[in-house]
Amino acid sequence: QPLKKYLENNSSYLGICVGMQILSDWGYEDKTTRGLGIISGDIKKFKNKKLIIPHMGWNTINLNKDDTIITNSFDKKDFYFVHSYIFQNIKKSDVLAFTLYGQKFPSIVKKGNIYGVQFHPEKSHKHGLNLIKNYILKS
């Protein structure tokens, strides 16, 4: 509850991987679990049964739109992913970037001052470090 209260005050937040997923309404990993409900949507397993899960390795993000932290300089850059579940049923207006891995999924989400990234910027070399730097300097 302290995190939800903090986020409801439009405080600055950068959720990484599961830290992004907890922003959703519901998660369906082992059992149905209520999320924080900050960004509407659900966390579900990849739909494509032919994919190797977890999605692990480098993949490209594609910006829908940029803002002060997630700028055009990140478009078409590779970041490091390790996950089996993705944000689904999310409003397009809450998605800053998407990635393709058997299907299109949100890789960066935003609502107010709250950001979530499905990838691991701390493992993503210079692009990841630049994203973290932008977040620290501009949030």
Show the residue positions of the predicted features.
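Amide-donor transfer/coupling interface in amidating biosynthetic enzymes
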Residues: 5-8, 41-139
